[in-house]
């Protein structure tokens, strides 16, 4: 038994419990570190025998050793649970564990031999209902993803509405991650009520035209240091309407969400926090100093691993898409869309002029005050994959080909080309070493969605393109079913083969 933060280590002094046998074939623990919490263990058979030595110390964890820490931990083991079985026989035994507030102590009875099997069957029934609702039939890959999606949907206490967790076990709900994952977790699974609640949750927290970057674990006010979460919000709203599209859905968007979208457009056009503003060329500038406001946001003290201050390519691709989405909504609601259409036209002209890298046949990553960053990164893929884009067909194809050739890495997409002098192919070692690699070559699973969407677009959704896209998904499927946290997709992978899974487990 342990009781600690996910990445912490425990000593004997950290693991102090009130521990007593209970009446249901097990024992009850109350942690000294959280006296309002109760942990109950019960068993359908066997007897408890107190252990003379109640602590297993110096347990070594390989992942922590790889990260250049001692990797030693301690577990509290108050009892041995012993069973007597006849030779050459088998039996079914149920072990149950519950965690609840002390004041909510449930009425427990000793479990039967098949209690655990019954509980597992109830969970399976729930998962089966999710699969049936999603409607993918006997597609095992899709059904596994439907079940995996469920673990990230949670209810936020501050709003009483649904939100999306960015990853398990250590990420809370992040605005950017929520909006990127929104379509896959709620629309592709046909959880439309959850989708609506998630849009409402983040609409309530828009501040100075900015969707929260993250909600802290301890319930403090949200943080807003992001330039892209607000623009991804338009993508989520547009996707919601394209899948649902009922008059009641448009009514909901018009009343609850559309005013927020206009607020965001106004804030970005006239300037808001974190040096986010529209420049004279209608492109969005974001970030300054130590502020990291794109998804490549590693900062340790005064060290910024991937400074992208200026006009990042994906921010401006999202900006154009947001203007087009708002214009379409204005027209649907019988309002004047000309201000959004005219601004989108200016953005498109400036984007094609400033971002196209003729030499490399792709897009610059950032337009900086002192030049243009020609690093080949995956951010440019969104200038092709988003619903509203600005490139010619030939330019879009070249972007996809560049990402395919330079960045595709097994189940993910590299964050930087291996040809770059700052490329790091292995995400391992001490925290500074890992931070240096996080966005400098490490491959990311979520980027595969944007790449495959762009790939299908430039190849006109042909049967050949679909076949190739499924081939690109094969490493994802293998990882999902055989590697890491089985049934989930890891946050990141080494940029170098064999692309070992790293980071957040799900």
Model features per residue range: what roles?
Residues 1-506:
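Acidic, mature catalytic/reactive cores of soluble proteins
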């Amino acid at each position: 038994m342990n009781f600690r933060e996910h990445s912490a280590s425990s000593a004997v002094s950290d693991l102090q419990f009130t521990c007593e046998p209970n009446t249901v074939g097990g024992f009850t623990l109350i942690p000294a570190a959280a006296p309002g919490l109760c942990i109950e263990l019960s068993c359908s058979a066997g007897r408890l025998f107190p252990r003379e030595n109640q602590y297993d110390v110096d347990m070594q964890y390989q992942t922590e050793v790889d990260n250049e820490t001692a990797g030693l931990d301690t577990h509290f083991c108050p009892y041995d649970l012993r069973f007597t079985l006849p030779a050459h026989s088998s039996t079914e035994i149920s072990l149950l564990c519950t965690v609840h507030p002390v004041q909510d102590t449930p009425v427990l009875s000793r479990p039967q031999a098949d209690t655990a099997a019954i509980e597992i069957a109830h969970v399976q029934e729930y998962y089966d209902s999710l699969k049936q609702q999603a409607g993918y039939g006997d597609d095992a890959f899709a059904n596994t993803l439907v079940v995996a999606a469920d673990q990230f949907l949670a209810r936020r206490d501050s709003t009483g509405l649904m939100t999306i967790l960015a990853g398990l076990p250590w990420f809370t709900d992040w605005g950017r991650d929520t909006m990127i994952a929104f379509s896959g977790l709620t629309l592709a699974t046909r959880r439309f009520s959850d989708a609506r609640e998630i849009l409402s949750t983040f609409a309530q927290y828009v501040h100075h035209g900015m969707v929260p970057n993250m909600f802290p674990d301890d319930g403090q006010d949200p943080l807003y240091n992001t330039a892209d979460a607000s623009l991804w919000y338009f993508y989520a709203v547009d996707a919601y309407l394209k899948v649902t599209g009922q008059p009641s859905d448009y009514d909901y968007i018009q009343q609850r969400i559309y005013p927020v979208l206009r607020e965001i457009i106004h804030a970005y056009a006239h300037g808001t926090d974190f040096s986010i503003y529209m420049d004279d060329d209608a492109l969005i500038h974001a970030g300054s100093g130590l502020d990291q406001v794109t998804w490549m946001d590693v900062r340790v003290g005064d060290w910024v691993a991937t400074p992208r201050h200026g006009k990042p390519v994906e921010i401006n691709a999202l900006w154009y898409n947001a203007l087009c989405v708002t214009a379409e909504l204005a027209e649907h609601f019988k309002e004047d869309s000309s201000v959004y259409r005219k601004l989108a036209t200016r953005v498109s002209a400036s984007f094609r002029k400033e971002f196209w890298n003729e030499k490399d046949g792709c897009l610059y990553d950032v337009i900086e005050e002192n030049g243009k960053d020609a690093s080949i990164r995956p951010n440019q893929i969104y200038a092709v994959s988003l619903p509203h884009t600005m490139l010619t067909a030939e330019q879009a194809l070249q972007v996809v080909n560049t990402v395919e050739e330079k960045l595709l890495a097994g189940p993910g997409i590299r964050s930087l080309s291996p040809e770059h002098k700052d490329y790091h192919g292995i995400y391992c070692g001490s925290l500074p070493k890992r931070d240096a690699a996080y966005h400098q070559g490490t491959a990311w699973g979520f980027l595969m969605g944007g790449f495959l969407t762009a790939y299908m677009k430039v190849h006109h959704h042909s049967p050949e393109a679909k076949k190739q896209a499924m081939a690109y998904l094969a490493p994802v499927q293998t990882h999902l079913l055989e590697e890491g946290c089985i049934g989930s997709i890891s946050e990141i992978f080494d940029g170098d083969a064999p692309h070992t899974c790293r980071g957040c487990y799900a």
